[in-house]
Amino acid sequence: MAGRYFDEWTVGDRVEHSISRTVTETDNLLISTLTHNPQPLHIDHEAAAKTEFGKPLVNSVFTFGLMIGVSVNDTTLGTLVANLGYDKLTFPKPVFVGDTLRSESECIDLRESKSRPNAGIVTWAHRSFNQRGELVCECTRTALLQKKPE
């Protein structure tokens, strides 16, 4: 499914994204390596075993990136002018290797662009849940989207 144009969104629209993903150890190691994050809590099984979690936590950059990435097909694919910002990013529960994550997006604000008559600004609340239905990540995202061509 392609993303929606600005004028195809209504405040309150909610999308449950069809893509879910089971997190692997390779995912966690790659994102930690790519972002130069040597935090033992993510990559050192022995060190992580001594924490309250008892095992490595998945790097939150992966969790956030996956949540936003799986939303693109249903929200902004082919209609995005620019991402304007992310806000209120939280990680209420940890993610572990083997967790399966699913995400949803809800349109929470719309406004016309003052400087671009062919575009508008959309704000979504993005949420990601593990296989137990526990909220593991959430944020708001604001983007400038094209209006539907005439």
What are these regions (language model features)?
Residues 1-85, 149-150:
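Hot-dog-fold acyl-thioester-processing enzymes
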Residues 1-11, 91, 95-100, 104-150:
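HotDog/MaoC-like acyl-thioester-processing domains
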